[in-house]
From Swiss-Prot:
It comes from the Eukaryota. Residues 349-362 have a biased composition (Pro residues). Acts as a transcriptional repressor for CRX-activated photoreceptor gene regulation. GO terms for cellular component: cytosol; nucleus. Its main location: cytoplasm. It comes from Homo sapiens. Residues 335-369, 405-427 are annotated as: Disordered. One of its GO terms (biological process) is skeletal muscle cell differentiation. Residues 406-424 have a biased composition (Polar residues). This is Photoreceptor ankyrin repeat protein. SMART domains: ANK (SM00248). It is found in: Cytoplasm, Cytosol; Nucleus.
Amino acid sequence: MKVQPSVTCVASWGGIVHLEAFGDPVIVLRGAWAVPRVDCLIDTLRTPNASCMRKGTHLLVPCLEEEELALHRRRLDMSEALPCPGKETPTPGCRLGALYWACVHNDPTQLQAILDGGVSPEEATQVDSNGRTGLMVACYHGFQSVVALLSHCPFLDVNQQDKGGDTALMLAAQAGHVPLVSLLLNYYVGLDLERRDQRGLTALMKAAMRNRCADLTAVDPVRGKTALEWAVLTDSFDTVWRIRQLLRRPQVEQLSQHYKPEWPALSGLVAQAQAQAQVAPSLLERLQATLSLPFAPSPQEGGVLDHLVTATTSLASPFVTTACHTLCPDHPPSLGTRSKSVPELLGTAPPPPLVPQSPPGSPQRSPWVFVPYQSPQGILSKCLQWLQPRDSTSPRPQVPKILLSKASSSSHQCQPKPSPSGHQSLALPLWRYQELRIEKRKQEEEARMAQK
């Protein structure tokens, strides 16, 4: 029997709101409050222990009883003998472990039982024929509960790449799974945002090409384009607008304790309104105000609606009652800075996975070699010097002169073969114009020989 967990919202307008979980152990908060990246942490989202997992008090895990744990452990022992299903069996013989199949089948209860029993380094890093781990498959399909539980899995390398060079973050960003991207950024230690695939593309570039929404100035070594240029090239106008908004506002000021919920343009607008009230409007202004149709203006950047959203989502907002606290109030999220994950801020980060070191003296080779893209203009550099465009001030080299001379006729001339006599083979007829052409050629050759 699958347990329906009950989750309490951590923030609301003046009170506590209960949200329905829909059978999913991971709850995405929607509405006026959105938990900011890394900086706000729910008190209950700490490293869970075995007791809270069994009692169902943790937000990311379902309620498990002792009988259910024993039942799932028996299912895990039997899973090794199950036949491999169709497309989910990349390797012959089906030697993939139970951890991989729990991720593929989107079974968080079975995955939690596996994590409680302990995971070996071989099981955590096991891949299929495409080079993908269970975390990559879950990120590709959008299994949010599985990705949340795998954040507590030891020996798991979040930056592991498949045969195409894609990481778990690339697969989630390219597929447009925003909650999974947020989980990877906030709860996975050592996540490399600038890891590149075989084509030299980062996760941000792949998300921009897919119109989804790092370093915005990073370019791929093949085409030399940034994420904004890739978004423009692939007609991802929504992503272009988001990137430009992020460049205009590189820092989230309202998530700092030093933010004051005051509108800077308020004093200037009040003074302007008072000055206009003292001056009587002219006849033209009255006529224009009478004849003009009242259209609702769209929200402007830095206007009153923009300030309202910023003030209500700040940490010192008097309108929203929050039950969470920020871990780094002096360092709000900003563009160009790598924020720490929640386990790093809490000091509960697991040790990094062991990387096999090459023996000393052996050269370190990169797994992929990127070939730079050569524009059509670069072909001119390989041409001759006189073919390249030059300005009027530089000396222009002389164009070489090419003289063509016809080879003299050799003394040995091919004699026509005599036609065989008989009625079996007939000679081609020789017309009058052909005879005149032959005579003219003979005369020209005789005149040329006489001149020599």
